[in-house]
Every structure is written in structure tokens, then in C-alpha cells.
């Protein structure tokens, strides 16, 4: 189930994301470092040494796509008029990932690695943690549901 965010939580969520969203390469690097099984799902990166590809153009482009997706979703959250756009984005993510054999467990691994990254790059305290937990609970509720029903 989804729990609405207060205006203060929403503002903190968005402003804190804005402080890290340009660290695309570092975010994806942290996810791959913690989860080689996720890296293995990307044909252009499978089986390659992570440190040797981190500074490549391909890695930068793909990092931008992944982090850009989160930025787009986060930008739309909080305005009920944006729900159709959010649904379209999330349904597209779910169907493209299901087609590539990505499972719920890998989304959960991604989430855990993202939180770990955030906890080291934001002013992490109980308020920040609870805000991100709530926001990601809501986002992943929709993402995992869409993954389940995707064709």
C-alpha cells in the first residue's frame, strides 16, 4: 500500500535527491559493486571489470538513463495531475525489465544499494532515513506491482 507523504517529507525527498542526482556514474557503480548479478544483466557490462568500465562513455550514458529515470519520477511525484505520466513511466520500466528477465529480487537489491549510497552522500539522520524509506516504499510498491502484471 502507498502512504501519502507530508509536504515537508516531499520537499526533503526532492531536495535531497537534487544534491546527488548528478552523481549518476557513482550511483550505478555503487549498485554494480554491491550486486554483480545486476551488472551481469547488462550485456555491454557483463563479465567486465567494473573499475575498468566506470569511466567509459557507455557507462556514463547508461548511468544517466537509470538515474534520469529516477529524476523524472521524483520530479513528477507530489502532483496528482502527474499520475498518468508516472504510471506510463513505471509501466514502461516494468515491461522492459520483465522482458529482459529482471526479477523483483534485483529491484530490491538495487533499492538497498541506492539507500546505502544515499546514506553515505546525504546528511543522513532519522528524518532523512524515514523520508527516503517512505518515498521508496511508495515508488517500489508501484514498480513491483507493474513488474508483476507486465506482459
From Swiss-Prot:
Keywords annotated in UniProt: Heme, Iron, Metal-binding, Oxygen transport, Transport
InterPro entries named in the record: Erythrocruorin, Globin, Globin-like_sf, Globin/Proto, Mb-like_M
TM regions (residue ranges): none
Source organism (scientific name): Chironomus thummi thummi
GO MF annotation, one: metal ion binding
Pfam families given in the database record: Globin
Record-annotated disulphide pairs: none
Binding sites annotated in the UniProt record for heme b: 62, 97
Residue ranges constituting the Globin domain according to the UniProt record: 4-148
Domain of life: Eukaryota
SUPFAM superfamilies given in the database record: Globin-like
PROSITE patterns the record matches: GLOBIN
Subunit structure: Homodimer.
Additional note from the record: There are at least 12 different components in Midge globin.
PANTHER family: GLOBIN-LIKE PROTEIN
Name of protein: Globin CTT-VIII
Gene: CTT-8
Family designation: Belongs to the globin family.
Record's GO cellular component terms: extracellular region; hemoglobin complex
Amino acid at each position: 500500500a502507498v502512504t501519502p507523504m507530508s509536504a515537508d517529507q516531499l520537499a526533503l525527498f526532492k531536495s535531497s535527491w537534487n544534491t546527488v542526482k548528478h552523481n549518476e556514474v557513482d550511483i550505478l557503480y555503487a549498485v554494480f559493486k554491491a550486486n554483480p548479478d545486476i551488472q551481469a544483466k547488462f550485456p555491454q557490462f557483463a563479465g567486465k571489470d567494473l573499475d575498468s568500465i566506470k569511466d567509459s562513455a557507455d557507462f556514463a550514458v547508461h548511468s544517466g538513463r537509470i538515474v534520469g529515470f529516477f529524476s523524472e519520477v521524483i520530479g513528477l511525484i507530489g502532483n496528482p495531475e502527474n499520475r498518468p505520466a508516472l504510471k506510463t513511466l513505471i509501466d514502461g520500466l516494468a515491461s522492459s525489465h520483465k522482458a529482459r528477465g529482471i526479477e523483483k529480487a534485483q529491484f530490491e537489491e538495487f533499492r538497498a544499494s541506492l539507500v546505502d549510497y544515499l546514506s553515505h552522500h546525504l546528511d543522513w539522520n532519522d528524518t532523512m532515513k524515514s523520508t527516503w524509506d517512505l518515498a521508496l516504499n511508495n515508488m517500489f510498491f508501484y514498480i513491483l506491482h507493474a513488474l508483476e502484471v507486465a506482459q
